[in-house]
C-alpha cells in the first residue's frame, strides 16, 4: 500500500524517453509523438545516440548526459538493455520508470535494481499510462482521450486498447488510464490508495486477471470504495482461461467473496464492462432503488421490466397526485402506470411534459427514458429536446437519468449528443437495466457493510483446548480427522454434535450402541473411499442389536467386494438424529491459493461444485456478514428457505457460521473442514458427519487471511487510579450503540476540542466509520467497564496510518465525568506502544491552545508541542523511534 514514488509517476514534472527515435512505428517514436501531442507541460527529454533531435526536441546521447534528473523515465529500447539502463537511471536519481517489455527471466533482477535505488516501476509489459488532466500520454495508445472523472486500471494491454478505442468513439473522458502490465512493483492496491484521494477521480474501474497480495488488495479496495464506486471485471473464471492467461487466479467464487467484502461490484462480461464505463462516467449517485420507466412502445418497456425482475430490481409506485397530473397532460388513450407507455405516436412534446411532471415528484430515484425509432418523434430531435429540458429543469440534479435510444443508424447521433451532454445512454433496454442495477447493487453492498452487527448470544470458544487437540493429532502423524476425532474440537467452539464412537467390528458396534442408546447410525471409516454411498457405507435408524450387527457385517462385506484394496479403520457408531422435518446443509472450509481460507455454504451432494452449489465468504465473519451469506444462499437458490415443516432459522445458522469462522481464524493448522450433513431442525444445528484436514503451521497466523481479524492479543486489563479495573481492547463493529452512549456523556466543550466544531449528533454512517475499521490501516482502543454482562465505554483513542505506514494521525477522548483517573494517559500509552510495534515512525495530532489538559499530557508523553496561536491550533508530534531509544 506504499505511495512512495507514485506522485512522480502519475504527476511527473519531467520525462525522459530512453531509446527515442525518428523512425515511425518504433516504440521510441510513438512514445515521443504521444507525449508531445498530449500537451505535457514539463520538459520531455529524448535519449538516443542516433539522433540530434527527435520530433523537434533536442536529444541527449545517454542518461549520464541529461542536464537534470527526470521524475519519470520510459524504456523504449530492446529488452536486453533493460537492466543496464535501469541501473543508470537509478544512479542518476530517477524516481520512477515505465518498462514497456521484459522477459520473465529479467523480473527478479529488475526488481532488485529498483529496490536498491529506491525507484518505482510500472510494468513490465505495460501499455503505459495516460493522465489527461496533466496532459500526459506516456503510452502507446493510438488514440487520445478526453478529461473525465473515471479512472481505469487494467492488467491487460489488449483490453486497455479496446476500452480506449470505444471511449474515443463515445467522446468519453478519464482522469487516469493505467496499464499495469506484469505488476513487478507498482500494483493495483497502491493505485487504489492514490486514486481514492485524487480530486479528479469520482469512480474507478478495474480489469483484473490476478493478484499478488490479496490482503493488500481487499484492504485498499475497502477503503477506496467507501467514498467512490469501484467496479471490477475479472477474467480467468474457468481453468481453461487461467491456463491461457498463465495465471494462478484462485477459485472464482473466492473473487466474488472478496469483491463483495471490499464493497466493490463485479461485472461479468465485456458488454457489462462497457455499460459500467458509461454508468460510472455520467450517472449521478443513486438516492434509492426505485425506478421509473417511460417509453414510446410497450415491447421495449416489457424487455426492461423482464431484465429488472430477473435482477430483483424495484419499480417505483406513482402517487395519486402525480398520476392525476399525468392524466391531465397526456392523451386519454395513455394508461397511467409504471412503466408509462406513451404509445408509438408520442411526440417530443409528450416526452417533455411527462419529464417535467415526473421530475417535480419524489416518487422515484432513477428515471429510464426509452425511445424507439418513430416518425412522430425523430430520434435526434427528441434527444436534443430532452437534453435541453434536463439542462434547465431545477430538479434534474436530484434524479439519476438513464436514456435508451433503441436502434442503430437512426439513434447514433442521439447517443452522441447524450454522451456530450454527460447523460448516460445505452443501446438496449436490458443494457440500461444492467447499468441501473450495477449502481443499486453497489449502493446496497455499501449499506449492508455499514450495518451494525448484532451481538451473538452464547458464543463460546476454548481456543487453548482446540489448539491442544490439534497439536496432539499432528504430533501423532494424523493428517485427517473424522467425526469422532473432530467432535471435541467443534464442541470447544460451541457447536452441537451427536455422541459418536469408533467400533473395530460388529460386536464392538453392538456394545457401543447399547451404551449410547438406540436408534443409531453406522458409518464406514476409510481414507480410500471418498463417498461412503458408493458401498452403502452409511446405515441409518438401526433400532436393535441384531440390526446393528447385520448392518456392520454387511458394510464390511460390501467393501471387500467393491474395494478390496481399501484401508478400513472400523465404523463410526453415532446416535441417530431426529430428521423429521429437518433440513440438510453443508458447510465447507477450503484454502484458496490467493485469498486463503473460504467459508462455503450449500446443500451439498456427492459431486460438490462450489461455483454452482454454494455461496462463499471470507473469514472472519460477524453476525451481519454471516446473515448476508445465508440470505445470499437463499436468494440464489443454493439453499432452501425452509424444510417441509418449518422455515430455516437464519439467525441460528448465522451464529453457527460465526462459530466456524472463529475456529478457522484461531486455528491455522486447519487446512480443510467439511461438515456434511449439517442438520438444521428449528433452532438446532447439529454436525452429523465431519472431516478435518490438518497440517503443521509455522509463521504469522493472520497473514494467511485476506481480511485481518480482530486482534485478541491486544486485549489488556488495566487498573485505574481509583482501583477500578477496566478492559482496554480494540474497537469492534458491534460497539456502535455503546459508542453512541459514550459520546452522549462527553460535554460539548470536550467534543469541540476533539472535532474542532460543534456536533449535535453523530449519524449511523459516522459511527459505522468509527467502529467498522480495517485493523491493517487503523487502530482504535476502547476502555470498557463491564457491569452485569453489559459493557460501557469509558474512553477511546485511535490512530489512522498513512498508506506508507510512516505517519499516523491520533486522537483521544475520555468521558468527561471520568477525568483525573489516568484513563487518557493509559490509553495513549497503549496506542503509542501499538504504533511503535506496528513499524510507524511518527504519531501526529492537533488540539486547541486552551485544551491545557491534552497539551500537558502530550508533553509528559514526550510529544513535541508546536503552539500556533495565529492558526488557533497546537501541533503534537511524537518521534516513535527516538522514544523507543530513550
Where are these regions (language model features)?
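Short beta-strand element of the conserved SAM-dependent methyltransferase core
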Residues: 522, 573, 692, 783, ...
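Long, contiguous binding/interaction regions
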Residues: 697-886
Amino acid at each position: 500500500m506504499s505511495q512512495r514514488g507514485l506522485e512522480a509517476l502519475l504527476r511527473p514534472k519531467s520525462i525522459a524517453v530512453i531509446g527515442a527515435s525518428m523512425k515511425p512505428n518504433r516504440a521510441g517514436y510513438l512514445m515521443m509523438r504521444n507525449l508531445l501531442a498530449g500537451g505535457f507541460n514539463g520538459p520531455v527529454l529524448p535519449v538516443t545516440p542516433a539522433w540530434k533531435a527527435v520530433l523537434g526536441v533536442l536529444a541527449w546521447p545517454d542518461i549520464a548526459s541529461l542536464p537534470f534528473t527526470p521524475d519519470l523515465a520510459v524504456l523504449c529500447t530492446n529488452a536486453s538493455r533493460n537492466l543496464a539502463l535501469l541501473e543508470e537511471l537509478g544512479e542518476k536519481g530517477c524516481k520512477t520508470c515505465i518498462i514497456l517489455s521484459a522477459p520473465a527471466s529479467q523480473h527478479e533482477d529488475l526488481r532488485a535494481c529498483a529496490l536498491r535505488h529506491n525507484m518505482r516501476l510500472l510494468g513490465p509489459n505495460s501499455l503505459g499510462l495516460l493522465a489527461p488532466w496533466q496532459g500526459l500520454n506516456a503510452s502507446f495508445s493510438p488514440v487520445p482521450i478526453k478529461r473525465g472523472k473515471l479512472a481505469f486500471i487494467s492488467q491487460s494491454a489488449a483490453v486497455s486498447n479496446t476500452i480506449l478505442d470505444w471511449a474515443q468513439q463515445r467522446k468519453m473522458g478519464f482522469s487516469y488510464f493505467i496499464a499495469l502490465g506484469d505488476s513487478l512493483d507498482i500494483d493495483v492496491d497502491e493505485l487504489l490508495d492514490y486514486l481514492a484521494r485524487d480530486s479528479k477521480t469520482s469512480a474507478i474501474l478495474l480489469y483484473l486477471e490476478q493478484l499478488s497480495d490479496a490482503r493488500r488488495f481487499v484492504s485498499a479496495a475497502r477503503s477506496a470504495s467507501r467514498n467512490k464506486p469501484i467496479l471490477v471485471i475479472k477474467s480467468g473464471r474457468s481453468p481453461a482461461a487461467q491456463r491461457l492467461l498463465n495465471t494462478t487466479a484462485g477459485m472464482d467464487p473466492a473473487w466474488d467473496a472478496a469483491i463483495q467484502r471490499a464493497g466493490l461490484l463485479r461485472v461479468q462480461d465485456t458488454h457489462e464492462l462497457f455499460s459500467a464505463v458509461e454508468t460510472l462516467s455520467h450517472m449521478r449517485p443513486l438516492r434509492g432503488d426505485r425506478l421509473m420507466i417511460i417509453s414510446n412502445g410497450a415491447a421495449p418497456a416489457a424487455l426492461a421490466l423482464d431484465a429488472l425482475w430477473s435482477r430483483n430490481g424495484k419499480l417505483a409506485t406513482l402517487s395519486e397526485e402525480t398520476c392525476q397530473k399525468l392524466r391531465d397532460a397526456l392523451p386519454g388513450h395513455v394508461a397511467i402506470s409504471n412503466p408509462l407507455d406513451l404509445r408509438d405516436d408520442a411526440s417530443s412534446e409528450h416526452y417533455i411534459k411527462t419529464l417535467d411532471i415526473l421530475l417535480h415528484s419524489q416518487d422515484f430515484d432513477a428515471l429510464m427514458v426509452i425511445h424507439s425509432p418513430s416518425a412522430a418523434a425523430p430520434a435526434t430531435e427528441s434527444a436534443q429536446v430532452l437534453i435541453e429540458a434536463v439542462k434547465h429543469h431545477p430538479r434534474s440534479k436530484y434524479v439519476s437519468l438513464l436514456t435508451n435510444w433503441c436502434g442503430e443508424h437512426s439513434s447514433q447521433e442521439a447517443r452522441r449528443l447524450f454522451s456530450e451532454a454527460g447523460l448516460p445512454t445505452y443501446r438496449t433496454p436490458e443494457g440500461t437495466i444492467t447499468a441501473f442495477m450495477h449502481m443499486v447493487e453497489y449502493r446496497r453492498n455499501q449499506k449492508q457493510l455499514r450495518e451494525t452487527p448484532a451481538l451473538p448470544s452464547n458464543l463460546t470458544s476454548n481456543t487453548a483446548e482446540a489448539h491442544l487437540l490439534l497439536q496432539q493429532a499432528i504430533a501423532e502423524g494424523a493428517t485427517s480427522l473424522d467425526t469422532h476425532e473432530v467432535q471435541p474440537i467443534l464442541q470447544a467452539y460451541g457447536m452441537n454434535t451427536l455422541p459418536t464412537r469408533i467400533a473395530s467390528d460388529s460386536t464392538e458396534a453392538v456394545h457401543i450402541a447399547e451404551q449410547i442408546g438406540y436408534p443409531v447410525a453406522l458409518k464406514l471409516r476409510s481414507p480410500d473411499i471418498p463417498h461412503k454411498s458408493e458401498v452403502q457405507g452409511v446405515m441409518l435408524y438401526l433400532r436393535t442389536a441384531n440390526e446393528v450387527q447385520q448392518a456392520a457385517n454387511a458394510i464390511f462385506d460390501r467393501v471387500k467386494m467393491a474395494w478390496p484394496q481399501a484401508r478400513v479403520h472400523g465404523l463410526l457408531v453415532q446416535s441417530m438424529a431426529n430428521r423429521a422435518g429437518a433440513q440438510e446443509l453443508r458447510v465447507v472450509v477450503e484454502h484458496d491459493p490467493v485469498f486463503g481460507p473460504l467459508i462455503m455454504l450449500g446443500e451439498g451432494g456427492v459431486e460438490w461444485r462450489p461455483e454452482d452449489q454454494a455461496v462463499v465468504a471470507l473469514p472472519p465473519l460477524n453476525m451481519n456478514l454471516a446473515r448476508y451469506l445465508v440470505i445470499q444462499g437463499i436468494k440464489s437458490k443454493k439453499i432452501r428457505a425452509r424444510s417441509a415443516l418449518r422455515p430455516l432459522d437464519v439467525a441460528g445458522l448465522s451464529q453457527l457460521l460465526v462459530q466456524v469462522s472463529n475456529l478457522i481464524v484461531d486455528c491455522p493448522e486447519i487446512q480443510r473442514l467439511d461438515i456434511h450433513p449439517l442438520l438444521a431442525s428449528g433452532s438446532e444445528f447439529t454436525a452429523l458427519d465431519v472431516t478435518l484436514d490438518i497440517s503443521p503451521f509455522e509463521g504469522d497466523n493472520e497473514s494467511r487471511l485476506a481480511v485481518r481479524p480482530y486482534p485478541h492479543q491486544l486485549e489488556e486489563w488495566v487498573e485505574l487510579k481509583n482501583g477500578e479495573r477496566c478492559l482496554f481492547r480494540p474497537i469492534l463493529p458491534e460497539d456502535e450503540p455503546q459508542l453512541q452512549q459514550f459520546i452522549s456523556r462527553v460535554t460539548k466543550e470536550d467534543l469541540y476540542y476533539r472535532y474542532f466544531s460543534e456536533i449535535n449528533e453523530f449519524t449511523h454512517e459516522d459511527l459505522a466509520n468509527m467502529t467498522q475499521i480495517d485493523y491493517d490501516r487503523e487502530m482504535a482502543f476502547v476502555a470498557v467497564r463491564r457491569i452485569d454482562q453489559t459493557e460501557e465505554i469509558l474512553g477511546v483513542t485511535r490512530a489512522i496510518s498513512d498508506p506508507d505506514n510512516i505517519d499516523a494521525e491520533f486522537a483521544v477522548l475520555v468521558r468527561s465525568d471520568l477525568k483525573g483517573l489516568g484513563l487518557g494517559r493509559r490509553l495513549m500509552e497503549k496506542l503509542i506502544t501499538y504504533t511503535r510495534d506496528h513499524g510507524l515512525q511518527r504519531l501526529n495530532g492537533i488540539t486547541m491552545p486552551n485544551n491545557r489538559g491534552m497539551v500537558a499530557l502530550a508533553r509528559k508523553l514526550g510529544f513535541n508541542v508546536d503552539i500556533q496561536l495565529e492558526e488557533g491550533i497546537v501541533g503534537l508530534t511524537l518521534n516513535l523511534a527516538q522514544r523507543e531509544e530513550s
